[in-house]
UniProtKB/Swiss-Prot annotation:
Pathway(s) this gene product operates in, as recorded in its UniProt entry: Protein modification; protein ubiquitination
Domain of life: Eukaryota
PANTHER family: F-BOX_KELCH-REPEAT PROTEIN SKIP20, OS02G0208700 PROTEIN
InterPro entries found in the cross-reference section: F-box-like_dom_sf, F-box_dom, Kelch-typ_b-propeller, Kelch_1, KMD1-4
Species in which this protein is naturally found: Arabidopsis thaliana (Mouse-ear cress)
Protein name, entry field: F-box/kelch-repeat protein SKIP20
Pfam families: F-box (PF00646), Kelch_1 (PF01344)
Length: 418
């Protein structure tokens, strides 16, 4: 088993008296995430096991991990105690009260007229519940949300200052596998070297997050890129991209540690999305170009593309993406493109959304399923829908119960198992 007595001799005696360690682990992995805070206090051995990084792998292996979708979205109303309490987001009572009080004060503080307050919402797809994370300070508008599964962390990066509406360098780290409290801890990370918003962002490997492009405080499209090591809390600069790319979208290149920046537009061509992308190779420390990968000059890839579940053998070097399109838009159902180095490939499959072109949508992926939050004035407005894509016929869209406090269209999202 992955969790054992090997960890510096911290675990002594039986985890559960009278049971072999393997059976004891099988019992512990079945405890819902919301109770991990409580069972960590039972004994040192249990705390050591549940706080270890290998414990989540055991939960995934036994099919007991809970799938969370984290969304950065405008707050439509002050969070009620019901939204802040219970489930996997619960804390000790004192922490709950402090978090609620701080968030309420944030909502009451004066801001620029018309500027929404953003929050981090969490949908537990396993339990079909919604919660909002109590964060001790305001998070930036339009910040990027990215998860690093192996590290058990969700990061909020960049965006706009809610007071000045200027791009920021901020990094916030939410640790779901923290050793104390509810099993999550919130802190500030080291800021980026450059302030940016509307940029490409993706986790690559077990500890790294790459960012590239976006725009600065003068709305200039950026070529710059950098990488964050979440364990070392350090940023390192990368070579700049060939082109400045605002409103671009980022992806990990699946089996290899590459980083793909999809589409975007230049300073002088705002709103005209490029058909190409760029891929960073950490082995050569260089960028290559991939042509004809985004065929929609009038459509941003943000909220319309997501990483699909891997279905390719180990020799596949690149990424497979879902492209979410309106029911009325013309498009190929599938296309494949290689970069100019002939090393990387991007495979794109289209998924038809249950909406028309007049509806606002933010789409992504969650546990191998397509997921879409629907906005605008359509019939399905304010709801989330999921589609099981593994079925031969492509599956059907189905509704997710979405409380009114969580119905606003998100800006970014990421998913993580706990």
């Amino acid at each position: 088993m992955g969790v054992s007595k090997k960890k510096s001799g911290e675990i002594r005696g039986d985890l559960i008296p009278g049971l072999p360690e393997e059976l004891a682990i099988e019992c512990l992995v079945r405890v819902p995430f919301q109770f991990h805070s409580s069972i960590k206090s039972v004994c040192r051995s249990w705390k050591c096991v549940i706080s270890s990084r290998s414990f989540i792998k055991e939960r995934i292996g036994f099919g007991k991990a809970e799938s969370l979708l984290c969304l950065v979205q405008p707050l439509t109303s002050p969070p009620s105690p019901a939204m802040m309490e219970g489930g996997e987001m619960s804390q000790k009572k004192k922490e709950e009260e402090e978090g609620e009080s701080q968030m309420t004060q944030q909502l009451l503080q004066p801001r620029i007229t018309g500027t929404p307050l953003y929050g981090l919402s969490v949908y537990n797809a396993t339990l079909d519940t919604w919660h909002r994370v109590a964060i001790p300070e305001r998070i930036p508008l339009f910040c990027e949300c990215v998860a690093i599964q192996d590290a058990g962390k969700v990061l909020l990066i960049g965006g706009w200052d809610p007071e000045t509406l200027q791009p920021v360098r901020d990094v916030f780290v939410l640790d779901f596998f923290a050793g104390e409290g509810s099993g999550r801890r919130f802190r500030r990370g080291r800021p980026m070297s450059a302030a940016r918003s509307f940029f490409a962002c993706a986790s690559v490997g077990s500890t790294k997050v790459y960012v590239a492009g976006g725009h600065d405080d003068q709305k200039n499209a950026l070529r710059s890129a950098e990488v964050y090591d979440v364990e070392k809390d350090e940023w390192s600069m990368l070579p700049p991209m060939t082109e400045g790319r605002d409103e671009c979208h980022g992806f990990s290149m699946a089996t290899d540690p590459g980083f793909c920046v999809l589409s975007g537009y230049g300073t002088e061509t705002q709103g005209q999305f490029r058909s190409d992308g760029e891929i960073y190779d950490p082995i050569t420390n260089s960028w290559s170009t991939i042509e004809n990968v985004w065929p929609f000059p009038d459509l941003s890839p943000r909220g319309r593309t997501a990483a699909a579940a891997a279905e390719f053998p180990g020799d596949f070097r690149g990424c497979r993406l879902w492209c979410f399109i309106d029911s009325e838009r013309q498009s190929q159902p599938h296309w494949e493109v290689e970069d100019d180095s002939m090393k990387w490939k991007v495979i794109m499959d289209t998924i038809r959304l249950p909406v028309t072109t007049m509806t606002s949508v933010f789409a992504g992926s969650l546990s191998g399923q397509a997921v879409a939050m629907i906005g605008g004035g359509g019939e399905e407005s304010g709801t989330m829908m999921v589609k099981t894509t593994a079925e031969k016929n492509g599956g059907k869209w189905s509704h997710v119960n979405t409380p009114s406090g969580f119905s606003s269209l998100p800006f970014s999202c990421s998913s993580i198992y706990v």
